[in-house]
Amino acid sequence: MGGGVVHLVSAKNTRRLEGPDMIVLHYTAGTSAESSALFLTRPDVSASAHVVIGREGEVFQLVPFNIEAWHAGKSWYAGRGGLNRYSIGIELDNLGKLRFSGGLFIAECGRVVPPEEVYTDCSGDRPMYWHRYTARQVRVLREICTLLEETYPIRDVVGHSAITPRKIDPGPALEFAFSEFQDRN
């Protein structure tokens, strides 16, 4: 996976997973993979993930794959709820949905995103703008998903928005990266 994995400890996560049999993909909406990983390991934060993948392909593992992470929230998919118990959560360092204002693409955190890093989704009645995922992220994501599928009985790879209707991540900019996994299932 290029460069190895940085292991951080999310001591708040101790319950064993039942499975896992699905992978849930998220974006961080944070300013860097490292800052997002450190945030998610804080004991006062009621969220966590198994892995954070940075824009250069760097990987931070926060929770072992056989331990429950808190990434799915109130969730439901294929007739089953409480998906933290059955799923592996992968966060990708990405600013998510952008707004266009004054000729600039601006993330929710206030960061300006260069036009070459913007994905335009024209599937609705007006264009929506999203931060692009990098080729390295997509490659590492595919490698991790493949390894997980070889190790666990993974049936589904879905976006957070597919299991929690109030969420929009990982957004349409990532659809191409995990559609091949969905097509196999």
Please annotate each region the language model reported:
Residues 2-155:
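Active-site-adjacent loop/helix surface patches within enzyme catalytic domains
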